[in-house]
Amino acid sequence: MEVNDKFFAQDDIFWENYLKGRPRVPDSFFDRIFDYHKAKGGHFGTVHDVGAGNGPYALRLRSRFDHVIVSDIVANNIELARRRLQGEEGFSFRTSRLQDADDIAAGSVDMVFATNVMHFADPQDIAMAAIAHQLRPGALFRQGGRQLLNKANDPTETARVMLRTQGTRGIQSMLPLDDVHQTTPEPNYTGPDDAEIYEDDEGWSFETDLAGVKEHFESFPFVSQFPGAFTEMYRELDDLLADGKPVQGYFPVKVILATRS
């Protein structure tokens, strides 16, 4: 397995499961981003959807921007995005790592939209430099298991990716405790003038059943590679959620909004 560039190298069946298993993003999510961008005097010319997969959010971005660049590290994902957006105007497509942006003119992008992708970029400083290169002044940057380590061809890099997903307030890290020694914590870049806001948004709550829980698990690319690792957990879920018992919860979301000076 390649470390980062093959995690989401999946077929259209996976992406169908992905769209079913991941949260239905509420309008409030995009409204917050667009309102912030407008309040900062940003233009709505070009937005770059990086790590876009098969482009599930591209049309929503196009509803406000004149042009959407859809890019992903996996060529097949970009082909799936082309099919998904066939006949639509205002889109261009590129296959590239997030860190590689030399083909994009400096200062030509009004917003970089990075959803569930920044933790894969390594090294992080090169990724941020690539984002800064393409953003015009006043433009917006929006970022919102052990078996995996054993199969990765660079466990140290994969450990850094997993550590960057470590959450707070009860969110469990993906990195096994006895593998933390492989890497060091990422630095905290929160500055004294940055605002951290915690709030509840009902749009991220959900109620589902056993089938819905399994759809969510199957939206992660490594689940299908290690079916045996989930056998016992699925057996427990079958007992807990028998007879259509509902599951209620919410998806925790962290959004970073930053304007290029």
Curated annotation (Swiss-Prot):
One family name in Pfam for this protein: Methyltransf_11
Disruption-associated phenotype: Impairs the production of neosartorin but accumulates no metabolites related to the neosartorin pathway.
Region (Methyltransferase domain): 49-141
E.C. designation(s): 2.1.1.-
Span of the signal peptide: none
Family from the record: Belongs to the methyltransferase superfamily.
Name by which UniProt lists this protein: Methyltransferase nsrG
Any GO MF annotation of the entry: S-adenosylmethionine-dependent methyltransferase activity
Keywords, comma-separated and alphabetical: Methyltransferase, S-adenosyl-L-methionine, Transferase
Gene expressing this chain: nsrG
Class of enzymatic activity (EC top level): transferase
Pathway the protein contributes to: Secondary metabolite biosynthesis
